[in-house]
Regions:
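C-terminal transmembrane helix-loop-helix hairpin of multi-pass membrane proteins
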Residues: 71-73, 77-78, 251-357
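Cytoplasmic-side transmembrane-helix entry/capping segments in multi-pass membrane proteins
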Residues: 123-134, 151-157, 179, 191-207, ...
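C-terminal ends of transmembrane helices
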Residues: 62-65, 109-123, 162-196, 239-255, ...
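Structural signature of hydrophobic alpha-helical transmembrane segments
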Residues: 91-108, 148-161, 221-238, 296-312
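Hydrophobic alpha-helical segments and helix pairs
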Residues: 151-227
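Central hydrophobic cores of alpha-helical transmembrane segments in multi-pass inner-membrane proteins
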Residues: 84-85, 104-115, 135-139, 158-167
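N-terminal signal-anchor module of multipass membrane proteins
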Residues: 2-15, 19-113, 348-352
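Internal active-site segments that recognize and position negatively charged phosphoryl groups
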Residues: 194-276
Length: 357
């Protein structure tokens, strides 16, 4: 006879007597050593999560890829943004600056694609990652060469179609569990042999606009008249990411990034206006606004708006992928930094076009 744990019970008399004798011997040995059954404790296994962790914290810890970055390593995404913005500013001031900016954007797209699976915590095949990287690199190269941002939607659409096509042809054939007449009572519906095709497709497609958005850096660098805006965007992006490290909650980090971004944009624009360069920069930056509020005021307002726009772009990345201080892998942290760098130039380019530049 077996109990619910699958342990066989011995019901004959001999088995019962021998079992009772064994229990008596164990009790005598515990009494002689000064231990009682209630005082004997089995050490609990070490927990993989902190003692005060909630259920959601334990779930995130279990699903997070390793190795985890802790301590100073958790700021790797911020260091990635600082490196990319520094390289962009350096490439822009050197001869052939547009080509250098394209190379920096291509590097960021490669970092995004290689770590996208760890950042999104979803399966992304090598083919999908290659398409994501190729979409960003190709768009930056075309826009940086022609100066036409109108190529971006077309290349993004082609990339999305390519991702969907790859996912369709690599997905397994569904199992049909129904009978030929289709009247089987209680028959389960057709199911995929491998679940997650649609979530994987959605995750891969989400990376395409981020990679393609990096072409905004190439568009800013292509126009020589937008040099002040390009350097302003680099400086504000770097300062905003530093401010985004302040605090321990998403709300505090977002507020710090917004305040620091506004202050940085205001300070940089005020310095340019105080140096007397507003008359040379405003006609190519915000000509429509300059005709209404004046050149110096237009430049200062442009700096403030740049700080707000870049801050919101960085906050959006953190809102999409969770707090940047959460445990993550090295590739995921680098991909997060690349994503922040790529999207930070999109609102700046939009302001230039809306302002009449």
């Amino acid at each position: 006879m077996c109990d619910h744990d699958g342990v066989e019970r011995r019901t004959n008399g001999g088995g019962t007597a021998s079992g009772a004798a064994h229990v008596a011997r164990v009790r005598r040995s515990q009494t002689s050593s000064g231990a009682t059954p209630s005082s004997t404790k089995v050490p609990a296994p070490a927990s993989r999560t902190p003692a005060g962790a909630t259920r959601s914290d334990r779930a995130r810890a279990a699903s997070a890829p390793g190795p985890w970055l802790r301590g100073p390593g958790r700021h790797l995404s911020a260091w990635t943004v600082l490196l990319l913005t520094g390289l962009t500013a350096l490439a822009f001031v050197l001869p052939g600056g547009a080509r250098g900016v394209i190379a920096v954007v291509a590097l960021a797209c490669l970092g995004l694609a290689s770590g996208w699976s760890a950042l999104a915590r979803s399966r992304v095949s090598r083919i999908d990652a290659s398409i994501i990287a190729l979409a960003g690199v190709a768009t930056a190269a075309v826009v940086g060469t022609t100066g036409e941002m109108s190529w971006a939607p077309a290349l993004m659409g082609v990339s999305v179609v390519a991702l969907v096509t790859v996912e369709i042809f690599t997905a397994p054939t569904p199992h049909d569990h129904s009978r030929p007449d289709g009247t089987a009572p209680g028959a389960p519906p057709p199911q995929w042999l491998r679940a997650g095709s649609f979530p994987t497709m959605a995750v891969a497609v989400t990376a395409v606009p981020i990679a393609v958005g990096g072409a905004s850096w190439a568009a800013l660098a292509w126009n020589p008249g937008w040099s002040a805006t390009t350097l302003l965007a680099c400086a504000v992006t770097a300062v905003v990411v530093i401010g985004d490290q302040i605090g321990r909650t998403f709300r505090t980090q977002s507020l710090a990034a917004l305040v620091v971004g506004v202050v940085a944009g205001l300070v940089v624009a005020s310095v340019v206006a105080w140096a007397g360069s507003a008359g040379q920069l405003v006609p190519t930056v915000l000509p429509a606004l300059a005709g209404i509020v004046g050149e110096s005021a237009a430049l200062v307002l442009h700096g403030v708006l740049t700080g707000i726009a870049v801050s919101l772009a960085v906050i959006a990345v953190d809102a999409l992928f969770g707090e940047h201080r959460r445990p993550t892998s090295r590739s995921g942290a680098i991909a997060r930094g690349c994503a922040k760098f790529l999207v930070s130039a999109v609102p700046v380019y939009m302001m230039m076009r809306i302002g009449g530049a």
